[in-house]
Amino acid sequence: TTVHRQNRIINNIILETTLDITPKTIVGFENHGGRTYSNYTPLGNVLVGKGNNDTDGVEGVVYKNYIGTYLHGPILPKNPHVADYLILKALQNKYEVESLEKLDDTIEYLAHEKFLKLYNK
């Protein structure tokens, strides 16, 4: 269930994700007026920011092959492990693929780590 509120949630955000990926953190930006309440598995637990609403400490939803989130901006470039997860799941939906060829994500992970260091995480 999502309800609209006049005051927007505008924050940088850091999650500890429920996805089977490494690292376990997802960094991003949230800017939304909606407050979402769900019984589905969350994308992650909020370490910094507000998430789905101002009360339950979670962000996003994971249901089957679907991921919903309020995170936006450069979420995939700052979280290459999330990009790899999405690409792998999409390929596995049609093909017998077990893993992706590793790419050099050094710069992307530096951006991810710099974001975490801003909040001592």
Description of each model-found segment:
Residues 1-59:
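Pocket-forming structural segment of enzyme catalytic cores
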Residues 60-64:
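Short, flexible turn/loop "capping" segments at secondary-structure junctions
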Residues 65-121:
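Acyltransferase
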